[in-house]
Amino acid sequence: MAQSEYLFTSESVSEGHPDKVCDRISDAIVDAFLAEDPHSRVALETMATTNFVVLAGEVRGPDSLTHDRLKEIAREAIKDIGYEQRGFHWKDAEIVSHVHSQSADIAVGVDAAGNKDEGAGDQGIMFGYACTETEELMPAPIALSHAILKSLAEFRHGGDTSFGPDSKSQVTLRYVDGKPVGAASVVVSTQHAGNLSQDEVRELVRPHVLKVLPEGWMCPEEEFYVNPTGRFVIGGPDGDCGLTGRKIIVDTYGGAAPHGGGAFSGKDPTKVDRSAAYAARYLAKNVVAAGLAEKCVIQVSYAIGVSKPLSVYVNTQGTGQVDEQRLAVVLQQLMDLSPRGIRQHLQLSRPIYARTAAYGHFGRKPEKDGGFSWERTDLVAGLKTAFGA
């Protein structure tokens, strides 16, 4: 039986969080390869700690992207985020590259040849989700958590020196009859200038929270937590070691939907961990946008070297207006879910990934250059026609 009233929480982390610094660097390198050769293969991991960055992974692409060029790309990403502190500075951080060529065994099993279609780059399961809680058809807790941190980042990039790049947010919403009605608590931890007190930071953060929450949704004052430890001056990779791919729930639905376990950043779009998760979101969003359900979970699965998905599962969580099995069939008629089909349909072989590395891969606006193409709702007409809606 569904609960009539409950609390649900999601968190976000900023572009300056140590793990997000690594995601940004990894995706900037993916973009660099795709910009020169859209057929590049990239699996790039980054580690960042006190003034030290390690690049590692496997690539196949243009020779112009040397180790020195990869280091430059990493440095540019750190600069763009805004790190100019003693323990982590874009100018003098030591950056080493241990990137090497992709395994020939993987290439043979995955690449298309002759009459053989391109196979998936690995086995795995991927999920997509959409719901009617926000205009972006995203769960409200993660959408609001992202929005708070984006507001802080815009303030900082505008020239204010009160905040540092590293911050986190967490929003707990109260639900009644399955709908969010207000915030029960809000937590914001943000790196700040050393001369600011906790109370001063609290009042600087407050307007960014109020701007984001719908009117009347602000939590009780005693449930509004800003820097609960009292001080947050040392931040970023100088405070905690960062790694690519460690914020997969922040990147997706904030825990409101299942996750297959595969991270996105650092992977070119032939990797189904990334491309199939984007496709699953695209399909789920179109189902909800078409009015066929208020909630939609889609799971797809793949095997390495096999071009078609092994399974496609649709669950509208009791909100559907149509048969779920038929919906799964129709979705596969509207979109080729082979790795190549996904990449072509969503035009993913473009340098569009660095921008995804912070504030969520989903719930963003489609961009003219093809960025966030998986947020389009151009299947709505086809779905309505198929179901006579």
UniProtKB/Swiss-Prot annotation:
Family matches, as SUPFAM superfamilies: S-adenosylmethionine synthetase
Native organism is: Rhodospirillum rubrum (strain ATCC 11170 / ATH 1.1.1 / DSM 467 / LMG 4362 / NCIMB 8255 / S1)
Instruction: Return the CDD domains for the record.
Output: S-AdoMet_synt (cd18079)
What catalytic activity does the UniProt entry give for this protein?
Answer: L-methionine + ATP + H2O = S-adenosyl-L-methionine + phosphate + diphosphate
What keywords would UniProt list here? ATP-binding, Cytoplasm, Magnesium, Metal-binding, Nucleotide-binding, One-carbon metabolism, Potassium, Transferase
Which residues does the annotation say bind Mg(2+)? 19
The main enzyme category here is transferase
**Binding residues annotated for K(+), in chain numbering:** 45
Put simply, this protein is called S-adenosylmethionine synthase 2
User: Do you know which InterPro entries this protein is assigned to?
Assistant: ADOMET_SYNTHASE_CS, S-AdoMet_synt_C, S-AdoMet_synt_central, S-AdoMet_synt_N, S-AdoMet_synthetase, S-AdoMet_synthetase_sfam
